Amino acid sequence: MISRKSFDDQIKIVHNITYLSGSDEAGRGCLAGPLVVASVILKPDYFNPLIKDSKKLNPKTRQVLYDEIIKNCLDYQIIIISSKQVDELNPLQASLLGFKTTINNLKITPDLALIDGNQNIELTNIKTLQIIKGDDKSFSIACSSILAKVTRDKILDEYDQIYPNYDFKSHKGYCTKKHLLAIQKYGILDIHRKSYKPIKKISKETS
C-alpha cells in the first residue's frame, strides 16, 4: 500500500496541479453536539508518518498533530454546525454545507479538492474528487480529519463541564449505552439532535 503522502503526490502529478485540499468531518453520527467539517491545504514538503485517520489516534497525539498541521499548512478552514442546524438540514445536507463552505473559504483556491466519502459534491470553479475511506488513503484528508476531530472533542469536553451527568468527555456524544441511559434518566438537552431515531424514541417514551 502506498503512503498517504505518495497518494496525494500521485494525484497532483496525474491531474497536473499545484494546490490540493483535503476535507473531512467529525460527529455526523452523534446524538449530541455539533458536526464539524475541516478543509486544509498543506505545504508541499510537509509529511509526518504518524498522521492517519483521527479515530485511530489517542487524544494527546491528536492534539500534538493538530498543532503541527496548523503550522505546516498554507491555509485551513473549520466550520461548526450546531445540532439544531443538523436537525433542520439533515446530517447529509449539513455535511455537504460544511464541505462547500470550508473549501470555498480557503484563501488559496485549490486546483482539486479531495473529500472523504462517496457523496458527489459540486463546487463552482473547483474540481472535487470523493475518496472512500479517504482518511486512510490521503494525507490531506487525514490531516483534515484530525483538525475536525480535535475541534469537536474540545467542544464536547466543555459540554462535559456544563452537563456532568451525561459523561460527554468519554463518549463524545455518540450513541453508547451509557449515553442513552443518561438521556433516559436526566432528559434530552438542547444539544441533542431531536431528529435522530434514538432521541425520538426516548422523547416518545418520556412524553
UniProtKB/Swiss-Prot annotation:
Manganese or magnesium. Binds 1 divalent metal ion per monomer in the absence of substrate. May bind a second metal ion after substrate binding. Its EC number is 3.1.26.4. PROSITE patterns: RNASE_H_2 (PS51975). It holds the Pfam family RNase_HII. Coiled coil: none annotated. Disulfide bonds: none annotated. One of its GO terms (cellular component) is cytoplasm. It comes from the Bacteria. Transmembrane segments: none annotated. It is found in: Cytoplasm. It catalyses: Endonucleolytic cleavage to 5'-phosphomonoester. Belongs to the RNase HII family. HAMAP family: RNase_HII_B. NCBIfam families: PRK00015.1-3. This is Ribonuclease HII. It comes from Mycoplasma mycoides subsp. mycoides SC (strain CCUG 32753 / NCTC 10114 / PG1).
